Each structure stands twice: as C-alpha cells, then as structure tokens.
C-alpha cells in the first residue's frame, strides 16, 4: 500500500439521472454558478442538479476531514458524486474525497452537459 489513492471513478449522466436522490451530489462551482446568477452564456439553463450541496472547490480544499463530514453529512466509505461546470474542478474534488476515504465519483460532463439535456431536472 503506497498511500496514493486509486484513480478516481467517473459516473455517466444516465446513471446519475437514475440515481438522483439516492446518491449525494456535490457541486463545487462558485455560489453564483450554483444559484444561476452567474449566467454562464454557454449554458442554455442556469442553476444546479436537484439536491446537490454546494461547497466551492476553493473552500473544499481548505477543509479538514471533520469539516467535510459536517458540511456534507457523510462518513468515510460513503458514496458521493462531484460535479462542476466542465469536470475539471470536480476531478480535484473527487481525488481529494477519495484520499479521505469516500467513494467519490466525478461527473465529467458536469453542468455543461446537464444544462443541455432538457429532460433532466434542475433547481
């Protein structure tokens, strides 16, 4: 055992859509991206994935394990899906969470993909 986390897993939009409400979702975008007030011109819809908790990646990387558990309501070993706008910030979050013992998965398509799928719900 080297202490280096295994490469992080990914989740496809289809699986995430089916599992909404079952698996915790973490949005690591800024608050204004999360609430839709940032108004990203490349996204046809603004907001976030239903039920997602928002912890900006810049804050997440500064939190300790206890603070993350409190903010997310999770314990090590629990599954969680992270997303952002295009999958890069959520990749960092996924690695960080996996390093702390969570079963974290990255939704690579992130909001850029989700916002384009009219059949998918948003808040």
Residue ranges and their predicted role:
Residues 1-24, 28-81, 85-123:
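Rhodanese-like catalytic fold shared by cysteine-dependent sulfurtransferases
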């Amino acid at each position: 055992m080297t202490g280096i986390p295994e490469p992080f897993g990914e989740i496809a939009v289809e699986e995430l859509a089916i599992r909404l409400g079952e698996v915790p979702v973490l949005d690591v975008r800024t608050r204004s991206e999360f609430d839709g007030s940032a108004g990203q011109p490349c996204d046809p819809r603004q907001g976030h994935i239903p039920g997602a908790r928002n912890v900006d990646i810049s804050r997440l990387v500064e939190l300790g394990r206890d603070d993350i558990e409190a903010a997310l309501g999770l314990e090590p070993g629990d599954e969680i899906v992270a997303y952002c706008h295009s999958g890069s910030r959520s990749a960092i979050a996924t690695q960080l969470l996996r390093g702390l013992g969570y079963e974290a998965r990255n939704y690579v398509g992130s909001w850029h993909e989700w916002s384009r799928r009219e059949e998918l719900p948003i808040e």
